[in-house]
Design a protein with these regions (language model features):
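Non-core capping and flanking segments associated with repeat-based/extracellular domains
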Residues: 1-332
C-alpha cells in the first residue's frame, strides 16, 4: 500500500494553493484527520481576508449547518434515515457559485450537529450569523444546545423561534444568554404571560402568533420595523399608540409598522385623531429614517410633532385586515 501524500509538509504557498481548490466538506474532513491538520488549516483559512461567510444553523428534526460566501454555498443536514445517508449534491451555477450539499447519517443527529458546529466555527471566518431554534425538537437537550451556541456565538444577527409547543423558558434562556443584534422573528406559540425583555434596539421584530403581546409590550418594543399578527391589541389601544407616536412619546425610530386590526367594523376608532386622507392619484417621494428613498401613492397621513409623516394603509392579508404605517420625511 502506498503511503499517503505528506500534504502538511508542503511549503506554505503550495499548501495554500491546494486548499483553495478543496470544497468546504473536504476541508472539514481534512481538519478531522489530526489535531495538527486542524491547527494548520485553521491558521490558513482564517488568514484569508476575502474568505468570509454568512452562517445559518437550525435545530429542526434534521438539523442543518449552512454557510455561503461570494462563490460558495455549503449545506450539511443530519438525518437518522439510512436511505438518505451519505447523499450529496455538487454543481457549479452559471454565476460561478459552487453548491455543495451533504446528508450525513447519525444515530444521534443533534450531538453530531453540535460537533460539526464547533468545527465549522473554529475553521471558518463568519461575518454574519443566523440561528433558527425549533422549540419542538430535542426538548431535553435545548439548554445544552443554547449553551453551545453561547460558547461559539455571543451574538447573532438573526434569530428565529419556530414551533407549536409552548416553550417560554427556552426562548427566555436563549435571549438572556445570546444577544440578537438585528432581527428577531417569532414563528412560535408562547403563553399569554410571556414577557419579551430587550435591552437593545433591533432592525426588525416579527411576531406571527402575538397572543402574548399586549399594549404595554407594544409600547416597549425596540425596533425600526415591527410586524405583528394575532395580538389582542384593540382598536382603542391602537389609536392610543398612534397618538403617543404623534407626540414623540414612543417609537421615535420606527420606520414601518404592520399590525392586525382585530375589529375591522370599527376601524374608524383607530383614526380618531388628526389625519389627512391623500388622494390615490397623488404620488409623493420621501426619505425614511434608514435613509431609504421611497415613493408613496395615496394613503392616510398622520404627523408627528417633529415634522415626520406616518402614512397609513389598510390591506387584506389572507383573512386578516392589516394596518401598515410607513414613516418618512417628505421632500419639499
Amino acid at each position: 500500500m502506498s503511503k499517503p501524500f505528506p500534504l502538511l509538509k508542503l511549503p506554505r504557498l503550495a499548501l495554500d494553493e491546494i486548499l483553495i481548490t478543496m470544497r468546504p466538506f473536504e476541508l472539514i474532513q481534512f481538519s478531522m484527520t489530526s489535531s495538527k491538520s486542524r491547527i494548520i488549516l485553521k491558521y490558513l483559512l482564517r488568514a484569508r481576508v476575502n474568505s468570509k461567510y454568512i452562517l445559518l444553523v437550525n435545530t429542526f428534526n434534521e438539523p442543518k449547518i449552512t454557510f455561503f460566501g461570494s462563490d460558495t454555498y455549503f449545506d450539511c443536514q443530519f438525518t437518522s434515515n439510512k436511505l438518505r445517508s451519505e447523499k450529496s449534491e455538487y454543481f457549479e451555477a452559471q454565476n460561478g457559485l459552487k453548491y455543495d450539499r451533504i446528508w450525513m447519517y447519525s444515530d444521534n443527529v443533534i450531538m453530531d450537529w453540535m460537533r460539526l458546529f464547533k468545527i465549522v466555527m473554529e475553521l471558518f471566518n463568519f461575518q454574519r450569523h443566523a440561528v433558527i431554534l425549533c422549540l419542538d425538537t430535542f426538548p431535553d437537550q435545548k439548554k445544552t444546545i443554547i449553551d453551545l451556541m453561547r460558547s461559539q456565538l455571543p451574538s447573532v444577527n438573526y434569530c428565529g423561534f419556530h414551533g407549536k409547543i409552548v416553550a417560554d423558558q427556552d426562548v427566555e434562556y436563549f435571549l438572556k444568554n445570546i444577544n440578537v443584534t438585528e432581527y428577531l422573528d417569532f414563528k412560535c406559540k408562547l403563553s399569554d404571560n410571556f414577557q419579551l425583555k430587550l435591552t437593545n434596539n433591533l432592525e426588525k421584530i416579527s411576531v406571527t402568533e402575538g397572543n402574548w403581546l399586549n399594549y404595554s409590550q407594544l409600547i416597549q418594543l425596540k425596533a425600526l420595523d415591527v410586524e405583528i399578527k394575532g395580538s389582542k391589541i384593540t382598536n382603542v389601544e391602537m389609536n392610543a399608540f398612534l397618538i403617543s407616536w404623534m407626540m414623540s412619546k414612543c417609537h421615535q425610530d420606527i420606520v414601518r409598522l404592520e399590525i392586525q386590526v382585530n375589529d375591522p367594523e370599527t376601524r374608524d376608532v383607530i383614526l380618531d385623531l388628526p389625519h389627512e386622507i391623500i388622494d390615490n392619484d397623488v404620488i409623493r417621494e420621501g426619505r425614511t429614517f434608514k435613509n431609504e428613498i421611497i415613493r408613496m401613492r395615496g394613503g392616510i397621513d398622520i404627523k408627528r410633532n417633529d415634522g415626520a409623516t406616518g402614512t397609513i394603509y389598510f390591506k387584506i392579508d389572507g383573512d386578516q385586515l392589516m394596518l401598515n404605517m410607513i414613516v418618512f420625511c417628505l421632500y419639499e
